[in-house]
């Protein structure tokens, strides 16, 4: 573990925690803007450490910019004074005399996600990281298909697209599917006297909303516990982007969380549904500490533990989650995992995106070569040729398009 706020950017670059932007020194021209497609940490986490080097505004959707503000306020090493521009989807912004941009509404596992359209004299460059084409979202509106089609007709020079789930057949299931899965499990225990505790991504506001509403439906009070739950959910509610049931309470500070868990045990676990972090088995997270008996909240035989999140596939997460599940099961917990749908486009979603935009060139991104190369099969099927109009690139590589 490292303390991001107190660590120098060059040290973080060396550790591989944040991007190595020294490659920018080799490029001609000036950085005119830093554009953020959404508020997940792998997209905004490096902002406080890097953007002070550039005399450029930071542009994002309103929720993303609010999260960036919080990131910057927590920065201890650098003073970040870049202008922050909150741009709603559908609004156009002129970066320079020859460059314009627009956010196009899409869906992902965090609210206020956008696909970026950068307008150049040679055509649009569309940055689609990350996205899914959910026509029936739980929160927010469906993707702006009309705008994507319009951009395609006007001419797209290049599509830079995520590749995370391009190897999965069909279309990515709607968030409504996850809502039904979660509701099916929670409501089936309406008369149960055992505890129900749920863990999900704190940034997945639509999912947290679903869990809170299902808890309220069976007469239990939703409790959002942990600093990240507080940060993401309170911010969204203050911005009127979500409304949780009136019975919902939020506690972020660790000592307050401990007191809340102690009070919960005294008044009866069957009256509440704690919604917590820790679905990956992360050390120090609330669910992991509960599994280790490090909190006042004790698991008893028959208690229900729901995991509304997918395992992020790496060896450390697998080992940590296995250890956590083993401890929970040894205490008698009933575990329901994988109550989840992805926030990343599947193969047929990518197929639709390419047909909407009809780009001259495609660059697959977001993942190692094992993921980005999966896009090659689809690109070939669509008439693109490797190293001619479809490119597999590594960080720091350059490709001339026009």
Predicted regions, residues:
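Proline-aspartate-enriched helix->loop->beta-strand connector
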Residues: 56, 156-157, 350-367
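Conserved donor sugar-nucleotide recognition element shared by glycan-biosynthetic enzymes
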Residues: 346
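His/Asp/Glu-rich metal-coordinating catalytic cores
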Residues: 1-33, 40-260, 289-292, 319
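Residues that line or immediately flank small-molecule/substrate-binding pockets and catalytic motifs
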Residues: 38, 163, 366, 394
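Conserved SAM-binding loop
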Residues: 36, 57-60, 364, 392
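Structural motif
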Residues: 26, 85, 150-151, 266, ...
């Amino acid at each position: 573990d490292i303390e991001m706020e107190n660590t120098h950017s060059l040290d973080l670059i060396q550790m591989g925690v944040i991007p190595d932007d020294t490659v920018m020194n080799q490029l001609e021209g000036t950085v005119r803007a830093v554009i953020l497609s959404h508020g997940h940490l792998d997209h905004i986490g490096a902002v406080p450490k890097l953007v002070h080097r550039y005399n450029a505004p930071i542009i994002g959707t309103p929720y993303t910019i609010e999260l960036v503000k919080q990131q910057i306020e927590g920065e201890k090493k650098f003073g970040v004074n870049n202008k922050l521009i909150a741009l709603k989807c559908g609004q156009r912004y002129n970066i320079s005399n020859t460059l314009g941009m627009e956010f196009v509404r899409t869906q992902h596992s965090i609210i206020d996600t956008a696909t970026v359209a950068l307008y150049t004299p040679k055509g649009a460059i569309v940055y689609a990281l990350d996205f899914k084409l959910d026509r029936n979202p739980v929160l927010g509106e469906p993707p702006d298909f009309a705008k994507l089609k319009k951009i395609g007709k006007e001419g797209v020079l290049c599509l830079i697209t995520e590749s995370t789930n391009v190897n999965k057949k069909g279309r990515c299931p709607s968030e409504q599917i996850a809502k039904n899965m979660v509701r099916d499990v929670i409501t089936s225990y309406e008369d149960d006297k055992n505890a129900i505790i749920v863990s999900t991504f704190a940034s997945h506001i639509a999912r947290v909303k679903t869990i809170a509403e299902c808890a309220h439906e069976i007469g239990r009070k939703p409790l959002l516990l942990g600093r990240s739950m507080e940060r993401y959910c309170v911010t969204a509610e203050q911005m009127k982007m979500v409304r949780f049931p009136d019975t919902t309470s939020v506690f972020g500070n660790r000592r307050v969380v401990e007191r809340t868990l102690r009070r919960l045990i005294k008044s009866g676990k069957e009256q509440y549904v704690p919604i917590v972090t820790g679905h990956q088995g992360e050390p120090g997270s609330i669910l992991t500490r509960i599994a280790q008996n490090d909190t006042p909240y004790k698991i008893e035989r028959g208690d229900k533990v729901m995991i509304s999140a997918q395992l992020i596939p790496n060896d450390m997460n697998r080992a940590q989650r296995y250890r956590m599940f083993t401890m929970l099961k040894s205490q008698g917990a009933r575990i329901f995992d994988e109550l989840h749908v992805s926030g990343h486009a599947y193969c047929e979603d990518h197929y639709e995106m390419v047909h909407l935009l009809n780009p001259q060139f495609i660059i697959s991104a977001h993942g190692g070569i094992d993921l980005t190369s999966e896009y090659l099969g689809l690109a070939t099927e669509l008439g693109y040729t490797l190293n001619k109009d479809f490119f597999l690139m590594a960080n720091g590589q350059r490709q001339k398009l026009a």
